[in-house]
């Protein structure tokens, strides 16, 4: 039984090596187009200054309010 698990683990590691997993440093920046533009969320009509987040249209305004 243990040898079967060892063979299965070896096959899985050969098919999906750990180097294929991206680390946090390799992740692309989320919404890079919004980061390059000078968009102030404080002036957005959907920004709620009390909650300090956007209540609607989260693809335009960041950060989104939790539902």
Swiss-Prot record:
Residues 21-50 form a propeptide. It is found in: Secreted. Disulfide bonds join 53-65, 54-61, 58-64. Transmembrane segments: none annotated. GO terms for cellular component: extracellular region. It holds the Pfam family Conotoxin. The keyword Translocase does not apply. Residues 1-20 form the signal peptide. Expressed by the venom duct. The modification 4-hydroxyproline is found at residue 63. One of its GO terms (molecular function) is ion channel inhibitor activity. Keywords: Cleavage on pair of basic residues, Disulfide bond, Hydroxylation, Neurotoxin, Secreted, Signal, Toxin. The cysteine framework is III (CC-C-C-CC). Classified in the M-2 branch, since 2 residues stand between the fourth and the fifth cysteine residues. Belongs to the conotoxin M superfamily. This is Conotoxin TsMMSK-011. It comes from Conus tessulatus (Tessellate cone).
